Amino acid sequence: MKHLLRYYTLAAEKISYLRSPFLLAVRLYWGWQFVQTGWGKMHNISKITGFFMSLNIPFPAFNAYFVSGLEFFGGLLLIIGFASRFTGLLLAFNMLVAYWTADHEALVSFFSNPGKFYVADPYTFLFASLMVLILGAGLFSVDALVARRLEVQV
């Protein structure tokens, strides 16, 4: 049993080296996805405004510009790993609002029918945002460079 615990501890230590490369991959992929969705919204702002109007979102034109900018610039910030936790928070909130307004049925069926929640469009974006919010950007990020420069832990 002692050997098994030692091997487990050793394996866990080695696997922990994958944390930063994994977070980099998450940030690069999902950051790019956010950039693309934001860019698409920016170039179809009248459609997005109309869609927001159909969902009874207040100030639809303002919110169309706000959401498209948040997704585009938030995606860029994720890619470079700057202000990652704050960006993750804003993007996660954005995805929760997307659930609430566009996929409300999926959101309220979280416990009764989780499959509906998981297959809704905002899910993977929400999950990636929460990962960055909770785990941070990792070592391969501007956040880590700033933290080293300021001698603080991220």
Where are the predicted features?
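Short juxtamembrane and helix-loop transition motifs at transmembrane-helix boundaries
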Residues: 46-58, 85
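Extended, low-polarity transmembrane helix blocks
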Residues: 1-43, 61-69, 73-154
